């Protein structure tokens, strides 16, 4: 098995994630090379930008099916989580990877400013390895205008004008 792969989607800050992983003592690399990605030990799918741009890049690189059929752990961050779903309202509607059968929706904030930028709490009521040594109601930094609604795959919830999934899991797909 290979190492931890940070999947290059052509729209994320990969070097900060790479630095954080290496600081924890793990080896990783940034790539979009299909032969390397499919042999990864773990994948991190980061993303900043639009679902349309990320999906176009992943399709062009022939990575969509590799991601769908990947059986080792895969962690999506922000846009990376959103493209695990089957559809995004962003960019007038985008078909996404479809591992998690829910749609990504525009955040309705009840007059709070968009995008949602800043520190906010995540609340979880399920024990999960992802939350090891993280107290419930810990604060994380958010920058987004689209959300995954609370659903059967939700592990934690955050509120910004409405509740939304801040962490989801389906099988080996985490965010």
Curated annotation (Swiss-Prot):
EC number: 4.3.2.10, 3.5.1.2
UniProt name for this protein: Imidazole glycerol phosphate synthase subunit HisH
Pathway membership: Amino-acid biosynthesis; L-histidine biosynthesis; L-histidine from 5-phospho-alpha-D-ribose 1-diphosphate: step 5/9
Gene name in the database record: hisH
Keyword Zinc: no
Stored PANTHER family: IMIDAZOLE GLYCEROL PHOSPHATE SYNTHASE SUBUNIT HISH
Cross-referenced SUPFAM superfamilies: Class I glutamine amidotransferase-like
Active site: 78
Keywords, alphabetical: Amino-acid biosynthesis, Cytoplasm, Glutamine amidotransferase, Histidine biosynthesis, Hydrolase, Lyase
Reaction catalysis annotation: 5-[(5-phospho-1-deoxy-D-ribulos-1-ylimino)methylamino]-1-(5-phospho-beta-D-ribosyl)imidazole-4-carboxamide + L-glutamine = D-erythro-1-(imidazol-4-yl)glycerol 3-phosphate + 5-amino-1-(5-phospho-beta-D-ribosyl)imidazole-4-carboxamide + L-glutamate + H(+); L-glutamine + H2O = L-glutamate + NH4(+)
GO biological process: L-histidine biosynthetic process
Top-level lineage group: Bacteria
Pfam family for this entry, one: GATase
InterPro entries in UniProt: Class_I_gatase-like (IPR029062), GATASE (IPR017926), Imidazole-glycPsynth_HisH (IPR010139)
Bilayer-crossing regions: none
Domain Glutamine amidotransferase type-1: 3-175
Stored PROSITE patterns: GATASE_TYPE_1 (PS51273)
Organism (species): Buchnera aphidicola subsp. Diuraphis noxia
GO cellular component term, pick one: cytoplasm
MF annotations from Gene Ontology: glutaminase activity; imidazoleglycerol-phosphate synthase activity; lyase activity
């Amino acid at each position: 098995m290979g190492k931890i792969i940070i999947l290059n989607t052509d729209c994320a800050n990969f070097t900060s994630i790479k630095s954080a992983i290496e600081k924890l003592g793990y080896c990783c690399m940034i790539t979009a090379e299909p032969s390397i990605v499919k042999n990864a030990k773990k994948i991190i799918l980061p993303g900043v930008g639009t679902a349309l741009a990320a999906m176009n890049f992943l399709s062009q690189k022939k990575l969509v099916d590799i991601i769908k059929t990947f059986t080792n752990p895969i962690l999506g961050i922000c846009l990376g989580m959103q493209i695990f779903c089957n559809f995004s309202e962003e960019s007038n509607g985008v078909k996404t990877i479809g591992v998690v059968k829910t749609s990504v929706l525009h955040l309705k904030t009840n007059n709070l400013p968009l995008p949602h930028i800043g520190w906010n709490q995540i609340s979880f009521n399920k024990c999960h390895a992802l939350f090891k040594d993280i107290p419930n109601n810990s604060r994380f930094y958010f920058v987004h205008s689209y959300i995954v609604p609370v659903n059967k795959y939700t592990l934690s919830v955050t509120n910004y004008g409405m509740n939304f999934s801040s962490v989801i899991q389906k099988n080996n797909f985490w965010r």
